[in-house]
């Protein structure tokens, strides 16, 4: 299996970040990749509010990632934010593509070097 890693910088706009996913997924497909991995916060970069963009796994952002994967016949792993408890979010990886549909919620949050993921992310 050939895979691609898209080490990109996402911004604050989830729609613009979908454009990045589409762009780099197309490039990965052109190189013969069957799977492309995006960063954990590709939906919206850390450092911006997260609870206002969190959505369930069947929401429009995740469905657009599914559509990109389906149209390219490519497995995509992309980090998004889903609703957590008490107004927080979950740091979720969506894995979608031909023959696969699953997700993973991060459980070991990064609280070090002045960054406290646990202040806004639920584990």
Regions found by a protein language model. Name each.
Residues 7-24, 58:
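N-terminal phosphate-binding loop and adjacent alpha-helix
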Residues 12-15, 53-57, 112-116:
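Short, flexible loop segments at the rims of nucleotide/cofactor-binding pockets, characterized by
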Residues 21, 56-62, 119-121:
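Charged helix-capping and loop-helix junction motifs
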Residues 63, 67, 84-123:
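Active-site catalytic loop in hydrolytic enzyme cores
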Residues 1-12, 92, 103-105:
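Active-site-proximal beta-strand elements of phosphoester/diester hydrolases
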Residues 9, 42, 81-82, 109:
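Catalytic metal-binding/acid-base residues of hydrolase active sites
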Residues 58-84:
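A short, hydrophobic beta-strand-centered structural micro-motif
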Residues 3, 17, 25-54, 69, ...:
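Active-site beta-strand/loop signature of hydrolases that rely on acidic residues for catalysis
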């Amino acid at each position: 299996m050939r895979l691609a890693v898209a080490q990109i910088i996402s911004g604050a706009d989830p729609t613009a970040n979908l454009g990045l996913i589409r762009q780099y997924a197309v490039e990965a497909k052109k190189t013969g990749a069957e799977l492309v991995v995006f960063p954990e916060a590709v939906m919206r970069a850390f450092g911006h509010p997260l609870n206002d963009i969190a959505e369930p796994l069947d929401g429009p952002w995740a469905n657009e990632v599914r559509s990109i994967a389906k149209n390219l016949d490519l497995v995509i792993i992309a980090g998004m934010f889903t609703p957590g408890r008490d107004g927080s979010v979950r740091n979720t990886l969506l894995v979608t593509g031909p023959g696969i549909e699953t997700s993973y919620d991060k459980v070991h949050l990064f609280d070090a070097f002045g960054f406290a993921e646990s202040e806004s992310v639920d584990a």
